[in-house]
UniProtKB/Swiss-Prot annotation:
The keyword Metal-binding does not apply. Tetramer of two alpha and two beta chains. The alpha subunit is responsible for the aldol cleavage of indoleglycerol phosphate to indole and glyceraldehyde 3-phosphate. The gene is trpA. It comes from Shigella flexneri serotype 5b (strain 8401). Pathway: Amino-acid biosynthesis; L-tryptophan biosynthesis; L-tryptophan from chorismate: step 5/5. Belongs to the TrpA family. It holds the Pfam family Trp_syntA. This is Tryptophan synthase alpha chain.
Amino acid sequence: MERYESLFAQLKERKEGAFVPFVTLGDPGIEQSLKIIDTLIEAGADALELGIPFSDPLADGPTIQNATLRAFAAGVTPAQCFEMLALIRQKHPTIPIGLLMYANLVFNKGIDEFYAQCEKVGVDSVLVADVPVEESAPFRQAALCHNVAPIFICPPNADDDLLRQIASYGRGYTYLLSRAGVTGAENRAALPLNHLVAKLKEYNAAPPLQGFGISAPDQVKAAIDAGAAGAISGSAIVKIIEQHINEPEKMLAALKVFVQPMKAATRS
C-alpha cells in the first residue's frame, strides 16, 4: 500500500503524472507475459495493473476477453498467477502492483486467505470489479488487515454520497472511470472530469487515475490536465499483444514504442 504513496510523492516532486498499463497475467503464456511486464516497466510504466484470467469477465470488452482466452489456452491458473506476481515483485521491489479482478476468484480462495496471499507475494492493491461500494465491507476489511489497498471505481455519474464513500473506504488510488460501459480502446475517453476530481480531492480520496478508453498520449495529457494523478491504459496495450501474437520480439518492441510516448505525456 505504501508503494503508491511513495510513487505519488515522487511524481509530484518531478511534476509528472503516473502512466499505468494493464495486462492479463499469463497472456499469451507465462514466459512471454513476464517479458511483457519487464518491457512495460523498462519503457516507463510507473505502476502495474494486472488481471487474473477469469471465465466470465463482465466489465471487459472483447480485447481483454481475448487476452483471458489466450491465458486459458496456455493453461494459466490463479496459482500460477500468484507465482508470477512473486517473481515480478522480486525483480521490481518498488513498483506498485495492483490486481483487477472479479469476486468469484476471491471467494474461491476465501476472502481472508486471498488477501493474505496478496500480501505474501507483494501485491499493493486489489480492485474487485463486480463488487459495488455498498457490498464491499468484507473485502475492504480483509484487504486492510493484510496491508493491501482496496480500490474503488468512481463512475462519471457518481453522486455525492458515493464520492464520500469512495474517499472514505479507498486507499492507494481511485479508479476514475472515463465513461460507463465496457473497456475498450475504440470507445474514446470522454472528458472533462474536473468536477469529480475536485470533489474527490475535497473529500481527501486517494489520488485518481483515469481509465477506460485511454489509448493515445493526448488522452493521458488531458486526464492529467483535468486533475487526475495519471492514466491507466489496458485495451490499447492488450491489442498490441494480440496483433503480434506470433512474433514475440516484435511484440515487445511495439509495446515499448507505445508506452514511451504515453509516459512522456505525463510530464508537464
